[in-house]
């Protein structure tokens, strides 16, 4: 998802043309969302009925808990979880149901990160139950954002090396500072190295929340991989060994049961599903956003984006996406954990939750549903201690910087493209000594109008 206060994202893409060169990516995003603003008429489905604008259902004690977490310093919260901050009934409210499925939080995740989200998105509390303010790209983000940026870079002779895995960084001493002087890597399995010159800089994307992901198929379930089934985590472990200033990857890699979930993409050649969901929800594809199936044992949610979702998508094909947060619980219609289900079984469960029975056989026959198991997809949300995430430019290094979801940036929130772009901008401006800083994080909590709207909304929807 995107929203209007992703200032680093829009700053970067304000100079990147779309693939057709008609306008900048930033302008395209704002133009598109002006044309089709998100306004859900079916944020939750419960008991076979759509709930258009669910009441938050918070008690005064719950609201006081939110206010306390929002105001408590991060140092005092420490490595405690969200569950440590609230009574169990909080996690039965519509507010939590919508918050956790929109952002993929679990009760055992970091209370510090939850606090950051509360502050970062204070301006979205009013209207959150209809997803007001959430923005989308015209196509999927790869076609709408990654490809234009890659094209712009390639035109400026940036080289992209594929099928290459960096295995180690050799850190030497240079005037009392650590300096990367060699990069070890494997290209198609063959070891090699790059010598780093005195005027060279090394910027590393640290860790990966999509590392070791695996795909299933229509008739097979994805496997659950681990941190050694890829290079991102092993690289971080190697360079951080004995160097506390480079962080502690084990804080994010060693609790897969707390960081995994399953997503799926369904490709449909029969228009029945989209027609039925459109008629049921009252939203056209691309308008409503996330639909959470509140009764689902898997806590499954789906999104029907505007079609076509991919550049070059055939006219007779429609695509939607979904995911589940409780992937180890048996389904309500398919008595298997979501993590053990094939694509056909996942789609069968979704059809059952939506009470689509008459057309189910035809939809299943003409669809391909691909499940994806992502063991580390919410690893950036896991409880952490100070120092587990290194600084963008680690203390005592001369030519090294980190980017991505696992370096430390004050105030901003992970699991966003904004965090990645902010870290990259911080790395470049710092390493090269540029007289620039990234746009400041928007802090709506200091705007009295924003606070009043949020306060009013929360208290109007109490139980």
Regions found by a protein language model. Name each.
Residues 19-123, 135-136:
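Rossmann-like flavin
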Residues 162-182, 186-189:
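A conserved short coil-to-beta-strand element within the FAD-binding core of flavoproteins
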Residues 8-15, 98, 144-155, 345-353, ...:
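Amphipathic alpha-helical segments that form well-ordered structural scaffolds
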Residues 1-21, 26:
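Glycine-rich FAD cofactor-binding loop and adjacent beta-loop-alpha segment at the N-terminus
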Residues 114-127, 150, 161-165, 170:
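Catalytic cores of nucleotide-enabled group-transfer and carboxylate-activating enzymes in metabolic
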Residues 1-6, 131-154, 160-165, 336-339, ...:
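Short beta-strand to alpha-helix junction loop
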Residues 430-463:
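Active-site-proximal substrate-binding core of FAD-dependent oxidoreductases
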Residues 122-137, 195, 199-201, 206-422, ...:
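C-terminal segments that line or cap access tunnels to active or ligand-binding sites in enzymes
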């Amino acid at each position: 998802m995107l929203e209007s206060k992703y200032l680093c994202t829009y700053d970067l893409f304000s100079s990147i043309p779309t693939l057709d060169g008609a306008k900048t990516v930033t302008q395209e995003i704002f133009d598109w969302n002006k044309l089709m603003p998100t306004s859900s008429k079916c944020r939750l489905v419960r008991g076979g009925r759509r709930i258009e604008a669910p009441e938050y259902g918070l008690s005064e004690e719950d609201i006081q808990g939110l206010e306390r977490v929002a105001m408590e310093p991060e140092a005092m919260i420490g490595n405690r979880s969200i569950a440590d901050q609230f009574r169990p009934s909080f996690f039965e409210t519509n507010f939590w149901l919508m918050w956790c499925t929109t952002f993929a939080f679990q009760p055992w995740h970091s209370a510090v990160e939850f606090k950051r989200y509360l502050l970062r998105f204070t301006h979205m509390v009013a209207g959150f139950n209809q997803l007001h303010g959430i923005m989308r790209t015209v196509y999927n983000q790869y076609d709408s954002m990654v490809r234009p940026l890659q094209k712009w870079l390639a035109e400026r002779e940036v080289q992209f090396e594929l099928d290459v895995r960096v295995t180690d960084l050799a850190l030497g001493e240079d005037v009392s500072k650590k300096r990367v002087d060699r990069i070890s890597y494997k290209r198609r399995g063959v070891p090699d190295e790059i010598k780093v010159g005195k005027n060279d800089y090394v910027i590393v994307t640290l860790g990966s929340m999509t590392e070791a992901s695996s795909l299933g198929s229509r008739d097979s379930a994805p496997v659950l991989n681990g941190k050694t089934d890829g290079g991102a985590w092993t690289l971080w472990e190697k360079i951080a060994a004995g160097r506390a200033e480079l962080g502690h990857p084990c804080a994010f890699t060693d609790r897969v049961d707390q960081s995994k979930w399953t997503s799926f993409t369904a490709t449909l050649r029969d228009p029945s599903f989209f027609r039925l969901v459109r008629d049921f929800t009252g939203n056209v594809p691309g308008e409503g956003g996330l639909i959470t199936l509140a009764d689902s044992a898997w806590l499954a949610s789906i999104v029907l984006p505007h079609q076509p979702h991919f550049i070059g998508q055939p006219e007779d094909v429609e695509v939607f996406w979904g995911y589940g947060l409780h992937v180890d619980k048996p389904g309500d219609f398919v008595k298997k954990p979501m993590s053990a289900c094939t694509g056909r079984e996942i789609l069968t469960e979704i059809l059952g939750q939506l009470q689509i029975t008459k057309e189910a056989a035809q939809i299943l026959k003409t669809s391909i549903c691909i499940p994806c198991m992502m063991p580390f997809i919410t690893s950036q949300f896991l409880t952490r201690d100070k120092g587990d995430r290194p600084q963008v430019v680690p203390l005592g290094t001369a030519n090294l910087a980190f980017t991505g979801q696992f370096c430390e940036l004050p105030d901003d929130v992970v699991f966003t493209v904004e965090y990645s772009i902010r870290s990259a901008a911080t790395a470049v401006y710092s390493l090269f000594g540029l007289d620039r800083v990234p746009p400041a994080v928007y802090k709506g909590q200091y705007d009295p109008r924003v606070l009043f709207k949020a306060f009013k909304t929360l208290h109007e929807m109490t139980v």
